[in-house]
Structure formats: structure tokens, C-alpha cells
Amino acid sequence: HASYRRQRQMCIRDSPNTDYAYFMKGLAAFSKEKELLSSLPVLGDMTHKRDLSSAKVSFNELTEFITRFPESSYVEEAKSRMLFLRNLIAKQEIEIAEFYIKRKSYIAAVSRADYIISNLPNSPFVKEALEIKVEAYDLMEKKELKIQAEEILNKFIRASKE
């Protein structure tokens, strides 16, 4: 079995179309996400009501593809799709965090905001995530944490203007 696995890995690695196979693997999950999106009349605030696990799978598969095949001719297309997926996932996390704020589940809201800040740092929703943290800490009456979150938010805003 071990020699079979080694040979299989060598064949996969040496195949001239391996990059395409990995790219298509990422697109398969992306296609599922596009189908879900096209079935909704207007995306609007509906993101939080949908399961975006296929978007996350696609994002991870495309990340692996780019890591393994940085010189592939499909990299730019993969990056474009990842940008769309990243923003879709971040938007959902913001909507869920806002839902938690309304439900007074402040720790859960902070957790969702932290996910965006840590895992999707280049998304356009980072500022909103930081604002949610400030609001949640304020509502929990956690003065020190609120001050820290405000400082980070202010640094982020200043850095964004540069």
C-alpha cells in the first residue's frame, strides 16, 4: 500500500494538468455557492440566513491551489473568486454579529467580529467588526476592553487613510 501511495502522489504531482484539477476542485464548491446566490431574488440582508459552508470550502480549496501552484495560469481567476468569497463570508459574519448584538449575546458578537479580524483581515468589513467589538464591550460595561477596542479601531481608521 505504501508504494502505491508514493507512486500515486508522484503521478499526481508530475501530471501536466494537476493545477487545473486543483483549480476545478475549488470551483466545484464555488459553483454551489453561485447557485444558492442566483436562487435568491436579492442578496440584501439574507446572507446570515444561509449556510455558507460551501463558500468556506471553496475559499480553502482555492487557497490550497494558489499555494501549490503559484505559477499556474489559473491563479488570477482563483484570486478573483476568492475575493468574492472572502467578502461574502465576512458580510455574513457581520450580519450574524449584529444579530447577536440585538439578542444581547455580546460575547458571541465579539467572537464573530474576531473571526473577521483574524481570518479575513483584508476584507472591507474589518472596520465594522472593530465597531461591533466596541459596541459589545460598551453594552457589557467592560470599560477597559472597550477602550482597547476603540484604540485599535482608531489606529485602523488612521492606517486606512494613509
Residue spans for each PLM region:
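Short solvent-exposed coil/turn linkers within tandem alpha-helical repeat scaffolds
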Residues: 13-20, 34-36, 49-52, 65-80, ...
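Single conserved hydrophobic/aromatic residue that forms the stacking wall/gate
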Residues: 1-12
